[in-house]
């Protein structure tokens, strides 16, 4: 399968890198940092329901959290700027006898299957266990976790689309700015954003099929747009030149230039 072959080649490329030993130490630090934040998110997920119960006595804690889902998605969107886009990863495979569109599609599948899409569950699962389980049981917690994962996958494809367009032309930065500005206005001055977010979150907890289908449709649409955009941006990405620092030589050695 092409997906497993590309994954195996990526691991071999990392091992053959001259900086492999140093990269292993860097990976260890990354894993340690990730474990720290995972533990921190679990702690927040366990303690936050108590604060919500005291601060919003007329609402269930999971309703308060669901109203804040757009904020979590925005933070997740910003964090994903640390990852490369598929057009940045496709270069080693262009000489292979494989269709470029097929390569793009496989790399996009990798985007949806990244472990980072599960990272926020360190917060949402403990929170749901404290607040959702008493009303909807373990099934409600599992359904909620599945819905959150699907939202993060959709957010991953949205982030890839924006980053790819932004690398092509800086004017595309107005796309996410405009979208999040509208959400901010709708959230602070009107209630339709928080109302929709609360309704979606509760539908996910209750296992409503339409909620999952709606997110899957968004994922499919974003994946299709990414497939077309990534294909159009391949060669512009390959032709991009990285800025190399210029080495300045000392003036007292200029006389050597005359002798070649």
Listing of model-derived features with the role each one plays in the protein:
Residues 1-90, 100-260:
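Hydrophobic alpha-helical transmembrane segments of membrane proteins
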């Amino acid at each position: 399968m092409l997906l497993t072959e590309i994954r195996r080649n990526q691991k071999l490329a990392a091992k053959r890198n001259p900086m492999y030993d140093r990269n292993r130490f860097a990976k260890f630090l990354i894993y340690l940092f990730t474990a720290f934040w995972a533990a921190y998110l679990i702690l927040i997920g366990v303690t936050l329901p108590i604060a919500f119960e005291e601060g919003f006595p007329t609402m269930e804690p999971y309703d308060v959290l669901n109203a804040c889902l757009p904020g979590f998605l925005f933070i997740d969107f910003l964090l994903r700027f640390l990852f490369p886009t598929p057009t940045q990863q496709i270069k080693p495979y262009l000489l292979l006898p494989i269709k470029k569109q097929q390569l793009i599609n496989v790399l996009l599948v990798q985007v949806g299957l990244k472990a980072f899409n599960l990272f926020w569950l360190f917060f949402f699962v403990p929170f749901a266990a404290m607040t959702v389980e008493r009303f909807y049981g373990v099934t409600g917690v599992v359904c909620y976790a599945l819905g959150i994962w699907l939202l993060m996958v959709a957010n991953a494809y949205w982030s890839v689309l924006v980053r790819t367009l932004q690398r092509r032309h800086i004017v595309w930065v107005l796309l996410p700015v405009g979208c999040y500005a509208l959400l901010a206005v709708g959230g602070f001055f009107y209630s339709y954003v928080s109302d929709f977010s609360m309704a979606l979150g509760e539908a996910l907890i209750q296992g409503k099929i339409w909620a999952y289908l709606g997110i899957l449709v968004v994922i499919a649409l974003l994946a299709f747009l990414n497939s077309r955009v990534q294909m159009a941006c391949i060669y512009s990405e390959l032709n991009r030149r990285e800025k190399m620092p210029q080495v300045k030589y000392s003036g007292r050695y200029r006389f050597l230039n005359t002798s070649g």
